[in-house]
Each structure stands twice: as C-alpha cells, then as structure tokens.
Amino acid sequence: MVETKSIAPEFKKYLKFDSNNSNIRVGVAMSGGVDSSTVAYLLKQQGYDIFGVTMKTFKDEDSDAKKVCDDLGIEHYILDVRDEFKEKVVDYFVNEYMNGRTPNPCMVCNRYIKFGKMLDFILSKDASFMATGHYTKLKNGLLSVGDDSNKDQVYFLSQIEKNKLSKIIFPVGDLEKTKLRELAEQLGVRVYSKKDSQEICFVDDGKLKQFLIENTKGKAEKPGNIVDKNGNILGKHKGFSFYTIGQRKGLGISSEEPLYVLAFDRKTNNIIVGQNEDLFRDELIATRLNLFSVSSLEGLDNLECFAKTRSRDILHKCLLKKDGDNFQVKFIDNKVRAITPGQGIVFYNNDGNVIAGGFIEK
C-alpha cells in the first residue's frame, strides 16, 4: 500500500481502496513503461488481486516491468509470442511495404497478439480482466476517445474484437500524460521519468531501410524512376518500399517547388511525385472493417459519421457507401491530405465512440 498523504488531492480518487476488489483478479499488460507501471500501482492500491505480464516479441523484453512487479510484490510472467509476432506483425509489416503500402503494425499487434494471445494467457491465469495503460475509455461497452487528445490511442485499438472488450479495462483513460507522470512520481513508480517508447517497437529509430533490406534478403532494394504526373523522369529511387505517401525529404531531386510522394506504380516501379495540393483527396476505399456499434456491414451503408485516417488526425465528417465488402468513404466538409493505403481508418459517432475500424485500400 502507498502512503496517500503525499498524494495530491486531485489524484486521491484513483487510490481508493475497496476490500471487495480482493476477489477480482486482474492481469496487467506491462511493457516496463510509465503508463502500464502506473496502472499496476493504481490497481494494487485499489485492492485488486493483480499480476503482471510482459510479452517477449521481436526483441528482449524490458527488465523494468519485472522490477516494478517486484516493487509491488506481485507475480510477473513473461509470455513468449515471438513466433506469432513474427508471423502476424513483422511479416505483415514487411509485405505491406514491399507492395507499396504503409503498414500499421500496432493495429495488427493489438488484434492478434496483445488482445489475442496475451488476453488469452491472462484469462488462463484465472483473471477476470486484463488492464493496460492505453489512454482510452470504454463507454457502454464501446471504445471511446480518452481525455488526452495528444495521447488518445483508440485509433490503434480499433481492430480489437468487440466481444473481448468486456474483459478489458483502461484505468488511465481519463488522465493526461503529464498528469500521469506527476501521479507516478508521487506514487514512487521507479520509471516515472522514463521516455515513451518508439512508434515501431521492433525497428530501431532511423533503421527502417536497413530492417527492410535485411528482412527481404535485399529484395526491397529495387531501383526505379521518380516521375512527375506526366511521366517525366525527375530522378531515381532505390526501392519504393523505402518511401511513403506525402514524403518530401530524402527524394534526392531538385525542383523550384517542394515535391511530395503521391503514389507508387508497381507495374513500372515508378514513384509519382507532385505538389502539396496534389495530396488532397475527397474520398477513399476502406476495407476489412471491424464493427463495434453496428452488427453488420449493412448498418454502415449511407451512414454519416466522422473519420480519422491517422492517429493524430482531426475528425473528418464523411459519408459511407457500401461497395461489396468494402466502403467508399466520401469526405463532406474538406479534403484529406496524404491518404495512405495500408494505414488504418477509424469511424466515430458524435460522442467519440468508435463505430468501426478498418484499413485504407486506396
């Protein structure tokens, strides 16, 4: 138990002990970072019977998670998911880049690994719930945006199967990250000042090109031409797997005006570039939709809602039109910049609840 006298009044509500919680077993997904570590402290203080679980994925697991569990006097398990992670996340990641698409590995990992294999493991340990440090809420059984707009992670969780949400809790969804760090420091969490993890956990910062070369046995290096919209050759590229829609830096071409990657032509192996205004589109095709607030794809047809095409995007008003198993998404009030095939697209209602999540096809 933590001495709560040293805790600021604004945080006291997170530390209320309830003896009834001792009968509720919760597995905490622990990365070794400040978010999940603070979740473990809060649930322990609230009286839950908790244990920590850390996944062994592509790299060695973070030892800080074990240290935090030792500080709390709770069990810590290491779940080896290397084979599944390689198949479901890493191979997918590489294949998407090789096909001229920009993958979203966090979405895929959350569906199959974290809220798939890890959730199953936690429930097998007689736990009633799995807790994570995501800045997200559950409202009426649906995913909903967290209070910190800069850290809201519901976008990355939009591929979780709906029937699993009843087994998941997000204890810090109504906290801002800066406030969580303050609380963590006051609680004495050893990692309260630890830096946030990098976006792609299995690729070292600045080493994406090297990673793709190594994991494709050099096939990612497939030189071709950089052309304008009229097909005029402006320069050379070393392989379109190393580029993404909207990219400006690193093209190695000179122009009076800045040029950006607009598209990839797999047949010719060309990268097509243009000006910034050429990046704006008023529609896209969404595929592989995961449903939350509707029970069938037909429930989305002719639906007016809001969409995000990247995690820190603003909400764009849109209209959905069913097209087989896919959907045409028509943006109503404004065009959207740098729509990127392979990235996620998430649909929200007026209350910030997730209606469905999918991927951008084109």
Swiss-Prot record:
Q: What does this protein do?
A: Catalyzes the 2-thiolation of uridine at the wobble position (U34) of tRNA, leading to the formation of s(2)U34.
- Do you know which Pfam families this protein is assigned to? tRNA_Me_trans (PF03054), tRNA_Me_trans_C (PF20258), tRNA_Me_trans_M (PF20259)
Q: Name the gene.
A: mnmA1
Q: What is its EC number?
A: 2.8.1.13
Species of origin: Fusobacterium nucleatum subsp. nucleatum (strain ATCC 25586 / DSM 15643 / BCRC 10681 / CIP 101130 / JCM 8532 / KCTC 2640 / LMG 13131 / VPI 4355)
Q: Which CDD domains match?
A: MnmA_TRMU-like
The coiled-coil segments of this chain are none
The protein here is known as tRNA-specific 2-thiouridylase MnmA 1
Localization recorded for this chain is:
Cytoplasm
Broad EC category:
transferase
Where does the record place the region Interaction with tRNA? Answer: 151-153
Spell out the catalytic residues: 109, 201
Tell me the Gene Ontology biological-process terms attached to this UniProt entry: tRNA wobble position uridine thiolation
